[in-house]
């Protein structure tokens, strides 16, 4: 990942996060999420977007936030082998970051389960956590979601 990125900045709970715009397919408002019983804790369901079945991830659940209310916006991102919809409260802006406004994520904030917390940036004097969206799912989680999505396509 180069130092200069244009992130799509969004709010989840009280925090701001960003994802490289090159990985974002679209931003959708109020999609109809169909709940899937017995799915992974942070998969809130699936959505049929222009004929394509896409799993929906609750970032509040993934990040263990107390506020579990549903967001009004969905950011569709392209992972290496699939697409996933990220439930967010609000899309703030498409930012433009200079290299001197980006720092590595402090080591104290990173664990084996938070490898996706990539870097931190300052946009308009606000801290934005930049997500490495390719690491948001473990290989095992990604495989489970891929298999589930394939099953849904075949039904």
Label for each model-derived stretch:
Residues 1-155:
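An acidic, low-aromatic, low-complexity terminal/linker signal
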